[in-house]
Amino acid sequence: MAKDLEALARRKAKVRRAIRVAANGRPRLSVHRTSQHIYAQVIDDANGETLAAASSLEKDLRTSLKTGADTDAAKTIGKLVAERALAKGVTAVVFDRGAYIFHGRVKALAEGAREGGLQF
């Protein structure tokens, strides 16, 4: 168990280092997923503030989504966070998948954000 957690931490740190190099002043779209929900934030690391956020826990989404743990919910969250980021004037971001592989819900969120108008 400890080796798994260490590998997860190493993978997350590796992704963050690559993002810092590639960012060029762009904010990052950070993804967090649990077994029941998915969360996304657009974070400006230079100023240390969150510019936009969306999650499957929001009341208006909980009634419209079947569950917060499927690819349809992730795609909806991606579109919503893109809409909120565009309202704040953010058009280009760096995608931060954290320690998660780019597959399933994480990929669906990225596709939703691209459809919503974000470029990365």
Swiss-Prot record:
InterPro entries per record: Ribosomal_uL18_bac-type, Ribosomal_uL18_bac/euk
Any GO MF annotation of the entry: 5S rRNA binding
Keywords: Ribonucleoprotein, Ribosomal protein, RNA-binding, rRNA-binding
Gene Ontology cellular-component annotations: cytoplasm; ribonucleoprotein complex; ribosome
One Pfam family this sequence matches: Ribosomal_L18p
GO biological process: translation
Domain of life, per lineage: Bacteria
Subunit structure: Part of the 50S ribosomal subunit; part of the 5S rRNA/L5/L18/L25 subcomplex. Contacts the 5S and 23S rRNAs.
Protein family membership: Belongs to the universal ribosomal protein uL18 family.
HAMAP family: Ribosomal_uL18_B (MF_01337_B)
Function (record text): This is one of the proteins that bind and probably mediate the attachment of the 5S RNA into the large ribosomal subunit, where it forms part of the central protuberance.
Protein name as catalogued: Large ribosomal subunit protein uL18
Gene from which the chain derives: rplR
